[in-house]
Amino acid sequence: MKITTVATTPFSGQKPGTSGLRKKVKVFSQPGYLENFVQSIFDNLEGQQGKTLVLGGDGRYFNDVAIQIILRMAAAAGFGRVLVGCKGILSTPAASAVIRKQGAFGGIILSASHNPGGPDDDFGIKYNLGNGGPANENFTDAVFKRTQEISAYRLVESADIDLGRLGESRIGEMLVCVIDPVADYAELLESLFDFDQIAKLLARPDFRMRFDAMHAVNGPYAHAILEGRLGAPVGTVVNGTPLPDFGGGHPDPNPVYAADLVSALADPHSGLSFGAASDGDGDRNMIVGKGFIVSPSDSIAVIAANYKLIPAYAKGLAGVARSMPTSCALDRVAAELGISCYETPTGWKYFGSLLDAGKVTLCGEESAGTGSNHVREKDGLWAVSYTHLTLPTNREV
């Protein structure tokens, strides 16, 4: 295996934020820009030789190009195997699930979350650790320091990998496995929730739902889980095909950018009982009822209050956590349940140490993110599935 070393010079401003490095596509597409940042990640790893890396993104513009570059660089960095989502697709919570289930060393997720996509819009990259969660500040600070002094990056010359076909191929000595991006994640959700109960709800003639995937990454997941495994009518999922520019929309599940969904639920003639939407990389969510929207602060409180309805959590919650700007509704629920409620800075990565220590089971933040200890990222479809089982109509099934 021949490794090519390419001389480079630092770019300014490659400092990761709370969710990795995000810049305009035109910035990332500069020769060496992505390569410098990826090499700076790899230069701060120890023990990755022969190990597994998980790779994928939300399908936005530049996703496919970036994946081919990262695969070649991963081979040069000594990884033994890369699991990459088919067509380059892998939602953020699904990536976390795959990392954890497959015992991967870590993962690279390509997304700018709820920011718009396209040649003139945004792209992003972040590294997740072996626990499936975002890298901590010590690691990201070290990556930034490396970007300021980098002088070369390394790759293995190779033809592009066919990302549209499931199967195995090689770059040098490294095995590349193109995987079904939905399988491990769907299996995990089914282990947490009573899918038979949800399916009964979705089959009721007096209950209709709509899920707006916003032409983002959760489209294939929602089609496979809601319409496939749970039997919701075809057409329940709208805007379900991931597009590089999200169909010209802004993949942020809020009343402004998901106005069509909100309007449909407010229309008494629509026949809809329940609505939901998720963002670019599938980790945020919005829950909509008939003429009302569930605020993120209330969503995590409702989820915690109804934990006994969910098989995976019915034996009790270790504790709960919320970000500082999130309202105190969760605190009230925790007090009633007699469990601890922790407050963290903004950024999902701050929940990671609490989850890993077994101190909390459920987490929520002000920016439409909710999740639990099943992965180390917030999780849009998890929140939708959980909410299904808390609906009064479902308890009567």
Language model feature labels by segment:
Residues 87, 138-183, 289-374, 379-381:
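Proline/glycine-rich low-complexity loops and linkers
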Residues 38-53, 196-204:
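Glycine-rich phosphate/diphosphate-binding loops that line cofactor/substrate pockets in enzymes
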Residues 2-11, 32, 119-269:
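Gly/Ser/Thr-enriched, mixed-charge loops and adjacent short helices
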Residues 24, 52-58, 111, 128, ...:
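Short glycine-rich or small-residue beta-strand-to-loop segments that form or flank ligand, phosphate
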Residues 387-393:
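Conserved small/polar residues in nucleotide/adenosyl-binding loops
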Residues 15-25, 217, 364-366, 381-382:
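Conserved phosphate/anionic-ligand binding catalytic regions in large, soluble enzymes, centered on
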Residues 54, 58-121, 224-287:
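N-terminal small/polar loop signature for handling phosphorylated ligands or for N-terminal nucleophile
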